[in-house]
Structure formats: structure tokens, C-alpha cells
């Protein structure tokens, strides 16, 4: 699904806000994970109070720029799941 500029800006703003208050971040390659397993993981994440989202790599590079998580920029390759904890 193609995102227009406003959608991209909204995603970057939302995830940037979460990243600002995050204590830690985890980046995971989601290739090979079944839909059922991903659904389980997301449910467990919600219950644990973590923010979990699949975001386009180019947008994630914008999100982490200028944050303590900037060192993660090179890890955004392929289908990437980002998790922030507070």
C-alpha cells in the first residue's frame, strides 16, 4: 500500500514521540514469522506495555535520527519490527 506524504509524516511523528520517551529499543527481522506467531507476539507486547510496530525502513531512519537510538540506523534492512519499552 502506497503511503502519501501526510501518512508518512504522521507515522514518523507518532513513532518519534514514542522513541523520545523510550528506555530501550529492539529491532527484529520478521522474515519467516507466521501471522499467528506475530499476532501472539503483538498481544504479549501489548500486555507487557511495550510499543511494537512494523515501519518502513526509510521512515525508521528518520525516526531515530538525533536520538540515542541513532546507532540502529544501519539495522533497518528488510521487514523490520521495532519495539520500544518505557
Curated annotation (Swiss-Prot):
Pfam families in alphabetical order: Ribosomal_L10 (PF00466)
A GO term from the CC aspect: large ribosomal subunit
GO molecular function: rRNA binding; structural constituent of ribosome
One record GO biological process: translation
Keywords: Ribonucleoprotein, Ribosomal protein, RNA-binding, rRNA-binding
Annotated InterPro entries: Ribosomal_uL10 (IPR001790), Ribosomal_uL10-like_sf (IPR043141), Ribosomal_uL10_bac_type (IPR047865), Ribosomal_uL10_CS_bac (IPR002363)
Membrane-spanning parts: none
Family indicated by similarity: Belongs to the universal ribosomal protein uL10 family.
Role description: Forms part of the ribosomal stalk, playing a central role in the interaction of the ribosome with GTP-bound translation factors.
Subunit structure and binding partners: Part of the ribosomal stalk of the 50S ribosomal subunit. The N-terminus interacts with L11 and the large rRNA to form the base of the stalk. The C-terminus forms an elongated spine to which L12 dimers bind in a sequential fashion forming a multimeric L10(L12)X complex.
NCBIfam families with a match to the protein in the record: PRK00099.1-1
Family matches, as PANTHER family: 39S RIBOSOMAL PROTEIN L10, MITOCHONDRIAL
Protein's name according to its UniProt entry: Large ribosomal subunit protein uL10
Originating organism: Serratia marcescens
Amino acid at each position: 500500500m502506497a503511503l502519501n506524504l501526510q501518512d508518512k509524516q504522521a507515522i514518523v511523528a507518532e513513532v518519534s514521540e514514542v522513541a523520545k520517551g523510550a528506555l530501550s529499543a529492539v529491532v527484529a527481522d520478521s522474515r519467516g514469522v507466521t501471522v499467528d506467531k506475530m499476532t501472539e507476539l503483538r498481544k504479549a507486547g501489548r500486555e507487557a506495555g511495550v510499543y511494537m510496530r512494523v515501519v518502513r525502513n526509510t521512515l525508521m531512519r528518520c525516526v531515530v535520527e538525533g536520538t540515542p537510538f541513532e546507532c540502529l540506523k544501519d539495522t533497518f534492512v528488510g521487514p523490520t519490527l521495532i519495539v520500544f519499552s518505557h
